[in-house]
C-alpha cells in the first residue's frame, strides 16, 4: 500500500471501545460455537442437510476466533500492527472469509427452511447428505475465491513508527473490495427477507392445520436468522455507504473512522449470536443445552449410599433418562436429532 495514500488516526474512542468488545465476542463466541461444534461432532445421532449447513456456519464462526486475539492486540496498541505483512494479509483474509462464509450459510439455512415450510414436497428437501456436503464445499470454494484477493497485496500502511493493518483504504473507494462488501449484504438480505416473509405467511395460513408449538418454533427460527443477519451486517454497510457518499471530505475524519471501525466490529457479533440460530433450529437442541448445563452443575457426592442414590433417581439419572425420552420422540420431524447423554 502506498504510504502516502493513507492517514493514521490514533483515536482514543477506537482504542477504548474496540478491545472490550472484541474480548466479549471472543469469549462468548468461542464458548457458544465450541459447545455447538461439540454437539455436532459427538452428540448428533442423525445428520440431515440442514444439519450440515448449520455445522458449516459454526465452523465459519469458530474460524473467526483465531483472528480476534490479534485484532484485539492491534487496537490495544492504538492501531499499531506488529506482526508483519504476511500475518496482516492472513488475518484480513480470514476476517473477510468469516464474514462471507457466515453470510452464505445463514442465507442457505434460511432458504432450506423456506423450502421445508413453503414447498414441503419439493425435490430440494430430498437431497442426500452427500449432496448437501458437496454443496457446502462448492460454497466454501466460492467464498475463498471471492476473498483471496486480500492475500495478493500488502495492506500495511507505515508512517513513522506506526503501522496500520486495514482492508479498507479510508482515503478512497476500494473497487472490488467495496463491490464485494455491498453485494455480500444486499443480495443475501433480499433472499433472507423473501424467505422470512413467505415462511411466516405460509405458517399463518396453515395455523389451523398445524400444531401451534411447531408453528411458533419455525417462525422464531426464521425471524432469528433475519434478525442476526440485519443486526450484524447492516450497520457497517450503512457506515461504508456514508463514507463513499461523502469522500473525499470524510477521508481522514476521526468520527467517520470511529464509526466504520465500530460498525465493522458488529460483523464479529455474528459469531456470538449464531448460537441462537442453532438453539432455535431444532426442538432437541435446547434440551441438549439444558442437559449439558444441569450435568455440569450437578454436585458429585461419592459418599452417598445406594439407598440415597435410589431416592434421588429422578435427578441423578436425568441425563440417561433423557436419552430414553429422546428415543420415544424420535418420530417427530426435526432438523437433527441430538444425543442427550452428555453426563
UniProtKB/Swiss-Prot annotation:
Listed PROSITE patterns: G_PROTEIN_RECEP_F1_1, G_PROTEIN_RECEP_F1_2
Spans through the membrane: 22-42, 50-70, 91-111, 132-152, 183-203, 221-241, 260-280
Membrane topology: Multi-pass membrane protein
Bridged cysteine pairs (disulfide): 88-165
Designated name of the protein: Hydroxycarboxylic acid receptor 1
Location of the protein in the cell: Cell membrane
Residues carrying a glycan: 3
Ranges annotated as biased composition (Polar residues): 319-334
Organism field: Mus musculus (Mouse)
One Gene Ontology CC term in the entry: plasma membrane
Its biological purpose: Acts as a receptor for L-lactate and mediates its anti-lipolytic effect through a G(i)-protein-mediated pathway.
Record topological domains on the Extracellular side: 1-21, 71-90, 153-182, 242-259
Chain intervals for the UniProt region annotation (Disordered): 319-343
Family: Belongs to the G-protein coupled receptor 1 family.
Amino acid at each position: 500500500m502506498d504510504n502516502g495514500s493513507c492517514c493514521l488516526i490514533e483515536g482514543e474512542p477506537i482504542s477504548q471501545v474496540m478491545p472490550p468488545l472484541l474480548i466479549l465476542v471472543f469469549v462468548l463466541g468461542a464458548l457458544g460455537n465450541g459447545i455447538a461444534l461439540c454437539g455436532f461432532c459427538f452428540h448428533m445421532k442423525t445428520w440431515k442437510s440442514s444439519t450440515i449447513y448449520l455445522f458449516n456456519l459454526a465452523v465459519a464462526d469458530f474460524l473467526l476466533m483465531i483472528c480476534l486475539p490479534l485484532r484485539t492486540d492491534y487496537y490495544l496498541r492504538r492501531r499499531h500492527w506488529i506482526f508483519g505483512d504476511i500475518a496482516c494479509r492472513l488475518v484480513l483474509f480470514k476476517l473477510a472469509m468469516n464474514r462471507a462464509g457466515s453470510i452464505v450459510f445463514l442465507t442457505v439455512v434460511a432458504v432450506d427452511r423456506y423450502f421445508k415450510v413453503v414447498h414441503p414436497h419439493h425435490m430440494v428437501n430430498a437431497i442426500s447428505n452427500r449432496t448437501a456436503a458437496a454443496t457446502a464445499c462448492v460454497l466454501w470454494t466460492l467464498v475463498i475465491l471471492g476473498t483471496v484477493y486480500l492475500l495478493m497485496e500488502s495492506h500495511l500502511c507505515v508512517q513513522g513508527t506506526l503501522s496500520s493493518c486495514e482492508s479498507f483504504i479510508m482515503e478512497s473507494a476500494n473497487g472490488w473490495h467495496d463491490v464485494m462488501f455491498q453485494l455480500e449484504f444486499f443480495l443475501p438480505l433480499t433472499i433472507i427477507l423473501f424467505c422470512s416473509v413467505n415462511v411466516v405467511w405460509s405458517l399463518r395460513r396453515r395455523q389451523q392445520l398445524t400444531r401451534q408449538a411447531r408453528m411458533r418454533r419455525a417462525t422464531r427460527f426464521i425471524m432469528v436468522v433475519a434478525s442476526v443477519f440485519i443486526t450484524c451486517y447492516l450497520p457497517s454497510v450503512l457506515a461504508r455507504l456514508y463514507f463513499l457518499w461523502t469522500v473525499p471530505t470524510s477521508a481522514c475524519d476521526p468520527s467517520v473512522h470511529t464509526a466504520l471501525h465500530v460498525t465493522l466490529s458488529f460483523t464479529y457479533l455474528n459469531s456470538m449470536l449464531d448460537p441462537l440460530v442453532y438453539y432455535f433450529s431444532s426442538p432437541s437442541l435446547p434440551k441438549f443445552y439444558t442437559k449439558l448445563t444441569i450435568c455440569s452443575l450437578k454436585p458429585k457426592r461419592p459418599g452417598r449410599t445406594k439407598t440415597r442414590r435410589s431416592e434421588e433417581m429422578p435427578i441423578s439419572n436425568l441425563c440417561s433418562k433423557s436419552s430414553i425420552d429422546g428415543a420415544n420422540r424420535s418420530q417427530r420431524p426435526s432438523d437433527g436429532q441430538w444425543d442427550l447423554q452428555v453426563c
